[in-house]
């Protein structure tokens, strides 16, 4: 491969691309420099043909901690399995690229993006997307159009391309858009209740910048002039397809129109495959005729692929031409909705949300702030106090499957729902808890991630988390004939419609605006007009769902569950923190032990969070801490406990050490007492009333023991 270097011009940010210098055993090697961010993209594909009905594309995004000058914190001190950010970025790039591959290309492709250096203000995700696109574009793979991605923020009603971290912190919109020079192919965002119109304007704004980056890649492609792989359908394959379609057309259509289309289609498929198994295949080896297993296996695979193709064609035709959906709903009709709360007595909050044959059970757990998730990646270490986990067990689709670690899909769906809900959560100062929501998908027939948004919102309200507003989510689909430009937009798509459709647009939000969004396409783009219609149709469906949810619970409960821990926040002076912790944590451990294992979190700014399941224990702990940090004043009387007696080197009694609270001790000097033998009057552990008479420059305190009459009067 030729070694060449290219650089963008007339753009806000400068990208430099170096091709063919590194990792030269691959099909494509791209080094992308985006200011101080450096990403190496490699692409390798298999020459072995596959007879599959999908593209075996694998996109990997990996961060090396040396890119930010950090040593991994794990026991082995090396990078381990991919973290959530790496998985989500891998999915982001995959979803941007996949629509650009032709249906006939089914060879295995692996694109790996390795972050070698990182400037946090210049996103490695964008450099990876550029490198991934270019690696495919200059190869012989039939990937014909460049894609690029940009971030968009919004500050003071102005859109900003590729904002810095500081700008993003003040932005009401966090939007990532990917696309070709003609159309948008992928959208992902979370926002602070941003309107549909503002979103559409932001997407259009992003596309203007995307066009320039795509043209930059097209210019590089021209210099390499790659010869692309092509495929034409052979006459034998055409005849085989026509014969199969003619023979099974009416049966497939009838199965789709049945009341139980999904099961009927599956039964029909098994019936056709059983018939195909009866077809004999033989070959001759050394004048001996034997059964040809390979040919038989290939025949079954072709039959299954043809069935999938015919089913898709018939379903799309019914939707496009006759406006008939598999479950006979109207185009904008939402499936039957059901919801209930408080299913799990001991969980801190729970809700079940059912939409048609999709069902999500959400459970909420409230914990102390020290239980927040620590995120340690290339960026600075952060604490995450809200987590939403999505579980998709195989039984949810009536299948037998393996139980393993969360898949990339589960992590992606959970993060989307998490972003949707996080926009309406209370501030930490108003609700000092770590919040974990788990969504268990009990049934699935499409839109399970958006069912998770709904069940989570209901469960959080039921748990007493003061959400600003309820949040609902909906998936909108599209069937688009690119030859005639005829299209149909479908609200609340189910599994079959998602499978045969061209778009999956997931939008979650409140009655005011959008809080999270994700759009994936199976075609190379859609006109902006269709996107506008889809946004408005999604809004209509979202408001309908919110109305139904509000009938179950419309406002957060005023108190948390009786099983949830109670918390109290107090503000102290930062210099008083040491008085609570003590030497080696001695004092704070004493507080925890003497107050039934209470949890205490202390922040550097002086905020102290006290948490326990018993509210009285919380109050007693707070009162004790307040006594710890109180400042002794001369002339003020205090209850004190006698700790020990002091003697000088000759053994002569000096006085008694009295403790007002842990860390605050003073001396009752024998000279200030009217009796000679102090041990006759005081006993260790006895509580007495003392008066502070002096605090010297070194902080030493002198106490005066008050007469018993005064003590009795004060008691």
Curated annotation (Swiss-Prot):
One of its GO terms (cellular component) is cytosol. This is Polyribonucleotide nucleotidyltransferase. The keyword Metal-binding applies. It is found in: Cytoplasm. Mg(2+) binds at residues 498, 504. Residues 565-625 form the KH domain. Pfam families: KH_1 (PF00013), RNase_PH (PF01138), RNase_PH_C (PF03725). It catalyses: RNA(n+1) + phosphate = RNA(n) + a ribonucleoside 5'-diphosphate. The keyword Signal does not apply. One of its GO terms (biological process) is mRNA catabolic process. Keywords: Cytoplasm, Magnesium, Metal-binding, Nucleotidyltransferase, RNA-binding, Transferase. Transmembrane segments: none annotated. Residues 635-709 form the S1 motif domain. InterPro entries: ExoRNase_PH_dom1 (IPR001247), ExoRNase_PH_dom2 (IPR015847), ExoRNase_PH_dom2_sf (IPR036345), KH_dom (IPR004087), KH_dom_type_1 (IPR004088), KH_dom_type_1_sf (IPR036612), NA-bd_OB-fold (IPR012340), PNPase (IPR012162). Involved in mRNA degradation. Catalyzes the phosphorolysis of single-stranded polyribonucleotides processively in the 3'- to 5'-direction. The lineage of its organism: Bacteria, Bacillati, Mycoplasmatota, Mollicutes, Acholeplasmatales. Belongs to the polyribonucleotide nucleotidyltransferase family. Its EC number is 2.7.7.8.
């Amino acid at each position: 491969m030729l070694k060449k270097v290219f650089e963008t011009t007339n753009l806000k940010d400068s990208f430099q691309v170096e091709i063919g210098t590194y990792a030269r055993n691959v099909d494509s090697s791209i080094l992308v420099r985006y200011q101080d961010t450096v990403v190496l993209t490699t692409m390798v594909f298999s020459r072995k043909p596959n007879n599959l009905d999908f593209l075996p594309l694998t996109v990997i995004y990996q961060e090396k901690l040396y890119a930010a000058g950090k040593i991994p914190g794990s026991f082995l001190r090396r990078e381990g399995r991919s973290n959530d950010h790496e998985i989500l970025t891998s999915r982001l790039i995959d979803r941007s690229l996949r629509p650009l591959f032709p249906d006939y290309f089914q060879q295995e492709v692996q694109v790996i993006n390795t972050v070698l250096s990182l400037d946090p203000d210049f996103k490695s995700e964008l450099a990876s997307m550029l490198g991934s696109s270019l690696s495919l574009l200059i190869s012989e793979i039939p990937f014909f159009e460049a894609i690029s991605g940009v971030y968009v923020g919004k500050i003071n009603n102005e859109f900003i391309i590729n904002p810095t971290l500081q700008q993003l912190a003040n932005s009401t919109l966090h939007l990532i858009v990917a696309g070709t020079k003609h159309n948008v192919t992928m959208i992902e965002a979370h926002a602070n209740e941003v309107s549909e119109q503002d979103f559409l304007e932001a997407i259009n704004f992003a596309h203007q910048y995307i066009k320039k980056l795509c043209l930059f890649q097209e210019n590089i492609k021209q210099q390499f002039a790659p010869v692309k792989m092509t495929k034409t359908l052979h006459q034998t394959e055409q005849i085989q397809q026509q014969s199969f379609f003619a023979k099974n057309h009416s049966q497939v259509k009838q199965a789709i129109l049945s009341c139980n289309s999904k099961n009927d289609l599956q039964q029909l498929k098994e019936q056709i495959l059983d018939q195909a198994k009866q077809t004999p295949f033989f070959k001759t080896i050394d004048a001996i005729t034997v059964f040809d297993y390979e040919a038989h296996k290939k025949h079954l695979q072709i039959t299954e692929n043809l069935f999938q193709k015919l089913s898709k064609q018939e379903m799309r035709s019914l939707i496009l031409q006759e406006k008939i959906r598999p479950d006979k709903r109207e185009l904008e009709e939402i499936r039957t909705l059901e919801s209930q709360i408080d299913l799990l007595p001991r969980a801190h909050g729970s809700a079940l949300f059912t939409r048609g044959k999709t069902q999500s059970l959400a459970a909420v757990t409230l914990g102390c702030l020290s239980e927040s998730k620590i995120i340690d990646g290339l960026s600075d270490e952060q604490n995450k106090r809200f987590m939403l986990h999505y579980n998709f067990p195989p039984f949810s689709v009536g299948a037998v499957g393996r139980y393993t670690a969360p898949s990339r899909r589960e992590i992606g769906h959970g993060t989307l729902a998490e972003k949707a809900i996080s926009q309406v959560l209370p501030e930490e100062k108003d609700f000092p808890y770590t919040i974990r929501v788990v969504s268990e998908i009990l049934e699935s027939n499409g839109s399970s991630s958006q069912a998770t948004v709904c069940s989570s919102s209901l469960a959080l309200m039921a748990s007493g988390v003061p959400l600003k507003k309820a949040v609902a989510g909906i998936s909108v689909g599209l069937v688009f004939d690119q030859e005639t430009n005829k299209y149909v937009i479908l609200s609340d798509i189910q599994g079959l419609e998602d499978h045969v459709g061209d778009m999956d647009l997931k939008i979650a939000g409140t009655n005011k605006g959008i809080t999270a969004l994700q759009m994936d396409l199976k075609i190379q783009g859609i006109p902006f007009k269709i996107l506008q219609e889809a946004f408005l149709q999604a809004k209509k469906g979202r408001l309908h769902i919110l109305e139904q949810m509000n009938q179950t619970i419309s406002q957060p409960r005023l108190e948390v569950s009786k099983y949830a821990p109670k918390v109290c926040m107090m503000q102290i002076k930062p210099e008083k923190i040491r008085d609570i912790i003590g030497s080696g944590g001695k004092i704070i451990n004493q507080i925890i032990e003497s107050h039934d294992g209470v949890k205490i979190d202390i922040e550097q700014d002086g905020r102290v969070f006290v948490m326990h399941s018993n509210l009285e224990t919380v109050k007693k702990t707070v009162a004790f801490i307040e006594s710890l940090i109180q400042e002794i004043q001369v002339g003020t009387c205090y209850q004190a406990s006698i700790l020990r007696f002091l003697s000088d080197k000759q053994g002569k009694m000096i006085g008694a050490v009295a403790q007002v609270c842990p860390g605050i001790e003073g001396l009752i000097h024998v000279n200030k007492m009217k009796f000679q033998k102090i041990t006759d009057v005081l006993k260790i552990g006895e509580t007495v009333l003392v008066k502070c008479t002096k605090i010297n420059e070194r902080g030493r305190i002198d106490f005066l023991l008050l007469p018993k009459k005064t003590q009795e009067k004060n008691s």
